[in-house]
Amino acid sequence: MNIADYKGVWVFAEQREGELQKVSLELLGEGRRVADKLGVKLTALLLGSNVEGIKDLAEHGADEVLVADNKDLQHYTTDAYTKVICDLANERKPGILFVGATFIGRDLGPRVAARLNTGLTADCTSIDVEVENGDLLATRPAFGGNLMATIACPEHRPQMATVRPGVFEKVNTDGANCKVEKVEVKLTNNDLRTKVLEIIKSKKDIVDISEAKIIVAGGRGVGSKENFELLGELAKVLGGTVAGSRAAVEKGWIENAYQVGQTGKTVKPSIYIACGISGAIQHVAGMQDSDMIIAINKDETAPIMKVADYGIVGDVKNVLPELIAQAKEIISAE
């Protein structure tokens, strides 16, 4: 492998039922920064059938959009998407490939990396690049979250990383000079070992906590499911959303869809109220960029206090009723 032959930054533009996923636009924002630093082109890779969203990709930083349009790509399947992406990567030799750490990206990324005989750093929290050699420096928690590891893949290309939604910011550009190219798709029956027959959507009304402006989150220190209901009451008064740590999810106090942290979702609300959360690095990685962090904990030395803008030392079940009462009083007086 001649490393010098591999240039450019690619972003897999994930779409579901024709709708671009937010993480793809966020990755374009970070991809734009990396591409500018290296002085290379930023390419969005869009797969689907009668796909839309090209304009959005152009207006969020892409220099070029490669469109693989084929009826067999209408719905995501591992085999078909892997084949198309690997064929394009082998032909055009990108230096870096970013994929969103969604349920699709977590299935697709490792398969593509294995097929291309390269490495992949999963669930990155930050990304940088060495200009001299083009090496991608991907940082993520390691060893149970006890340290942050920066991982490089200097001997193989393309360098790959997955990033969860909410980690990076979108950028806006005019998109006037973005080039759109339709690429040939070569798929045979042997490449299509699975087929989507029907998509049945969940009837549950799940709130996307990554979009919430105010989050009241609870951890092990809340103590019980009954106490967890206090979080819901405070969130309702403030017009916010309830979330939880991994410990709260494992205890069955809140559903997995509302988990914040390295194994949950990354959030950036205006206000994040952490109730009974100790502040493990895995959790902090998912909420540390909140505009304001308020921590409620019996232990004034808990790690969460170090990242909080305001700390309240006390038992959640005693503090929350007071907060709820005062919030109601202030709101009713306005």
Curated annotation (Swiss-Prot):
One of its GO terms (biological process) is fatty acid beta-oxidation using acyl-CoA dehydrogenase. InterPro entries: DHS-like_NAD/FAD-binding_dom, ETF_a/b_N, ETF_a/FixB, ETF_alpha_N, ETF_asu_C, ETF_asu_C_CS, Rossmann-like_a/b/a_fold. Keywords: Electron transport, FAD, Flavoprotein, Transport. FAD binds at residues 271-299. The keyword Electron transport applies. Transmembrane segments: none annotated. Pfam families: ETF, ETF_alpha. One of its GO terms (molecular function) is electron transfer activity. It comes from the Bacteria. The keyword Electron transport applies. FixA and FixB form a heterodimer. May play a role in a redox process. Belongs to the ETF alpha-subunit/FixB family. This is Protein FixB. The lineage of its organism: Bacteria, Bacillati, Bacillota, Clostridia, Eubacteriales.
